[in-house]
Amino acid sequence: MNAPDLTRPPLTIRRISLDTGRENVAVISRRSRALRPEVFRGFSRVELRINSKVLLATLMITDDDAMIGPDEVGLSEPAFRRFNEPVGSAVSVTPARSPASLDAVRAKIQGHTLSAAEITAIVDDLAHFRYSDMEIAAFLISAARFTTTDELLALVGAMASVGTKLTWDTPIVVDKHCIGGIPGNRTTMIVVPIVAAHGLMIPKTSSRAITSPAGTADTMELLARVDLDVEQMKQVVHACGGCLVWGGHVNLSPADDILISVERPLSLDTPEQMVASIMSKKLAAGSTRLLIDFPVGPSAKVTSANEAMRLRKLFEFVGDHFGISVEVVTTDGRQPIGRGIGPVLEARDVMAVLGNKPGAPADLREKSLRLAAHLLEYDPKLRGGTGYARAKELLDSGAALKKMQQIIDAQGPSPCPAELGSYAADVLAAADGVVNGIDCLRINRLARSAGAPVAKGAGIDLFKKIGDRVEKGEPLYRVYASDRSEFDLALAAAQAESGFAINHHTPADVDLVS
């Protein structure tokens, strides 16, 4: 019996205004002359080819000829951008072979340990968009069951080697990272100018928010451009000693961004996956000294000292293997840090601290100073134990603010208006007493439901923190939104459950940084 003829008449490219995340999607008509029902099915993988240029995509089939004609193939926005061919170009569409590395994923599902070569092949296919989201999920779930230390090291190395790898002309390149989960907590934007003002190099790449109301990049974008390419980033670092840019535009460890896009909806966040994600980016960034902030609290990502210790050892193990000196500090994760939650409000807090303004959040200032102190003591010229005094000197003197302004000027003007949302209302205490707890997850969700971080001026402005005495009817915080429907949704949710625990017990003091 002869094999079926898989040759097809070419189709012409049509751009579809469809955001499919990071997945390439191709859409063809059920009446397409190129469609063979016995070969093509919805959600199968197809190969689009123009000469030597190839794009793999997940296929979807439509009965709506107004959307896609019989002689067309529609490309989602990510697919159209990556293929980079003009609308109307003739393209062949054929069934795609599964990546050979999927055999290793199947082996992992069955409980086998993977070799470094197998992991490298998987990461290469991930980075080149050869996996569908379902295939990525299969890999993540198989790795979540168990990952050996050898597999972890291979994964970090492979992820760091795909994409941009930065090198610097100084032996000490410092960096900091917080594992997240705490609202506000915008310490990076204070630590970077302090450290750079001292003279240590700190080329900071940061993420945009995924599940939080703001990432460092979302907040910094209100002050300066963050979408710098590699050469622009290097120019800023050489001129200023540091930068605050969006890592997604620099293309560090692109496979990690692809994995994260599937991890988040599945709520997958194992210690090994967290370590691989963070360390692959730091390795690619050329960091030699790394400070990691572990907030510990009942609604933080790390909820106990034992959990923090295990994660710390894993980070240090990977750092030792790749020549990165890793220091882990545990911090108070019981409540938000700073007053503002959401890009505009967080930028306000940062500039208040850098400007030494009356009323600047004391907890944000103190935590930033302590974290900066750890990084400054990587300088061999600085006497041990004097990092905090030096950090305080740089902040109090205005040197850190001056350095921040230099970084802002070098990165270029912000494209975003720094305006608070036009809708605002206070959420009130339901009883007299003392604030005994704040649910960080709840506060994050409320700020996001108000529109943050997409709406830069949306979020929550806190008036009370743990240990504060409140009276019934007194404002706990203010909700801001730029859209009426989002405002109504967030306010109703906050009034139903504020996220504040109020009783008559005095909470225990916890050190900000230990």
Curated annotation (Swiss-Prot):
Keyword annotations for this protein?
Glycosyltransferase, Transferase
**GO molecular function ontology, one term from the record:** 1,4-alpha-oligoglucan phosphorylase activity
Any GO CC annotation of this UniProt entry: cytosol
Q: Does the keyword Transferase apply?
A: yes
* EC number(s) reported in the record: 2.4.2.4
Q: Which Pfam families match?
A: Glycos_trans_3N (PF02885), Glycos_transf_3 (PF00591), PYNP_C (PF07831)
Enumerate the NCBIfam families for this protein.
ARCH_P_rylase, PRK04350.1
Protein name per its UniProtKB record: Putative thymidine phosphorylase
